[in-house]
């Protein structure tokens, strides 16, 4: 089994040089994604796992929205053409908006070997069972755990996520693989993403991952 794991594309506009109306950082992102497609052509993976944050911003103007959606759709369609199965999972809501993913899912609806995942669940493929744990939604969590302090929220949410890791593992029959868009304590943050987002940062404890005994853990979020 061969897996192409990717995440945190952040398709969108960034602060940086603009030449002839083209944002060069955004252009570089697209070039990197096109290079990834070339790798897929050469490697022919069985499964492509995209672990969240396809887009950079949830709320953008109509022109950018169209351009970014076309870019995402084209890249995913190309990956689907050169692999056997593609799983695209939603990341954090401030990047991967609910409306964006509804449109993305609709755009990819007729591509039979693509699954767009917005809720926790297990995707069963001929090669492995992929447990998917998309990014958090603050309001959804607070509805489940009302009236807690910030510290209590983090503890409750982290326990909830850990429980989901075990519950999804129990649904796996073939080779179990976890896709998740959360921080794992102890991860390498040398790229500059050095804060644990102290206001709100539920994590997956390493102990939970070890105990759940997934064959592979394919993360997004910290980069």
Indicate residue ranges for each PLM-predicted region.
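Conserved catalytic scaffold of divalent metal-dependent phosphoesterases
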Residues: 100-203
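Conserved protein kinase catalytic core
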Residues: 11-14, 59, 97, 140, ...
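Active-site metal-binding loops of divalent metal-dependent hydrolases
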Residues: 7-9, 15, 53-54, 92-94, ...
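Extreme N-terminal starter segment of soluble prokaryotic enzymes
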Residues: 1-4
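Core catalytic region of metal-dependent phosphoesterases/phosphodiesterases
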Residues: 21-123, 206-214, 222
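Glycine-rich N-terminal loop/short-helix segment of MobA-like nucleotidyltransferase
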Residues: 13-22
């Amino acid at each position: 089994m061969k897996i192409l794991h990717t995440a945190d594309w952040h398709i969108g506009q960034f602060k940086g040089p603009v030449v002839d109306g083209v944002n060069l950082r955004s252009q570089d992102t697209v070039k990197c994604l096109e290079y990834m497609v070339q790798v897929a052509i050469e490697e022919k993976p069985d499964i492509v796992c995209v672990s969240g944050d396809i887009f950079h911003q949830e709320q953008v103007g109509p022109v950018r929205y169209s351009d970014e959606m076309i870019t995402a759709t084209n890249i995913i369609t190309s990956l689907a053409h050169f692999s056997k199965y593609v799983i695209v999972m939603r990341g954090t809501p401030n990047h991967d908006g609910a409306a964006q993913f509804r449109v993305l899912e609709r755009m990819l609806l007729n591509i039979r070997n693509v699954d767009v995942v917005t809720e926790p669940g297990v995707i069963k493929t001929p090669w492995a069972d992929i447990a998917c744990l998309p990014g958090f939604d603050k309001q959804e969590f607070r509805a489940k755990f009302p009236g807690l302090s910030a510290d209590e929220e983090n503890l409750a949410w982290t326990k909830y996520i850990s429980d989901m890791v075990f519950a999804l593992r129990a649904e796996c029959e073939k080779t179990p693989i976890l896709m998740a868009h959360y921080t794992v304590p102890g991860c390498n943050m040398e790229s500059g993403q050095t804060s644990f987002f102290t206001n709100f940062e539920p994590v997956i404890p390493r102990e939970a991952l070890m105990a759940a005994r997934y064959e592979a853990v394919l993360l997004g979020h910290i980069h």
